[in-house]
Amino acid sequence: MDKFVKLTGVAAPLPVVNVDTDMIIPKDYLKTIKRTGLGTGLFAEARYHEDGSENADFVLNKPAYRDAKILVAGDNFGCGSSREHAPWALLDFGIRCVISTSFADIFYNNCFKNGILPIKVSQENLDKLMDDASRGSNAILTVDLENLEITGPDGGSIKFDLDEFKRHCLLNGLDDIGLTLEKGKAIDSFEKKNAASHPWAA
């Protein structure tokens, strides 16, 4: 998993509340267990017309936001059924940070396991960031995970809180496998001691 230390990029505004996982990645895209290629299905029902052509009015289809790395979204983002394909689709599109006032718990935790930083801010700060994100190609935000700070295009900054363990994992690019490997020496030492003291179980 790639480390997340500091991210600077275009922020796309999505002022919609209760965006559920079916909106993020429709069920038609859940047949694969591959993490790549799902970016085309991100918000598919909003991004495309029934004939498969792009909906020019959807934010991620607008030229200024096609390469967005940050999504500023309405309250309760990621609600609905549990599907890890949702963060996979965001990541494959290129989005590594989602900012909202709240997230569904399962989606929130799945983000960290896949290298995406979900940030919770107050409604007042979300309104400010949504306004910043509405500036088109000038909607550049910098998310500094080391200092827990978001800097807007006008230079103003917003602080955010994050569980220290989750912060450590993102800063060091550690998913569940990475965390296990980080304890590799301790695990090997235990296995050797356990085998020596319980030879019948070896």
Curated annotation (Swiss-Prot):
GO MF annotation, one: 3-isopropylmalate dehydratase activity
UniProt-listed SUPFAM superfamilies: LeuD/IlvD-like
Pathway(s): Amino-acid biosynthesis; L-leucine biosynthesis; L-leucine from 3-methyl-2-oxobutanoate: step 2/4
Uppermost EC category: lyase
GO biological process terms held by the UniProt record: L-leucine biosynthetic process
Keyword field contains Lyase: yes
Entry GO terms, CC: 3-isopropylmalate dehydratase complex
Entry's EC annotation: 4.2.1.33
Catalyses which reaction(s): (2R,3S)-3-isopropylmalate = (2S)-2-isopropylmalate
Protein keywords: Amino-acid biosynthesis, Branched-chain amino acid biosynthesis, Leucine biosynthesis, Lyase
Subunit structure: Heterodimer of LeuC and LeuD.
Function as written in the Swiss-Prot or TrEMBL entry: Catalyzes the isomerization between 2-isopropylmalate and 3-isopropylmalate, via the formation of 2-isopropylmaleate.
HAMAP family named among the record's database cross-references: LeuD_type1 (MF_01031)
Annotated PANTHER family: 3-ISOPROPYLMALATE DEHYDRATASE SMALL SUBUNIT (PTHR43345:SF5), 3-ISOPROPYLMALATE DEHYDRATASE SMALL SUBUNIT 2-RELATED-RELATED (PTHR43345)
UniProt record similarity statement: Belongs to the LeuD family. LeuD type 1 subfamily.
Protein known as: 3-isopropylmalate dehydratase small subunit
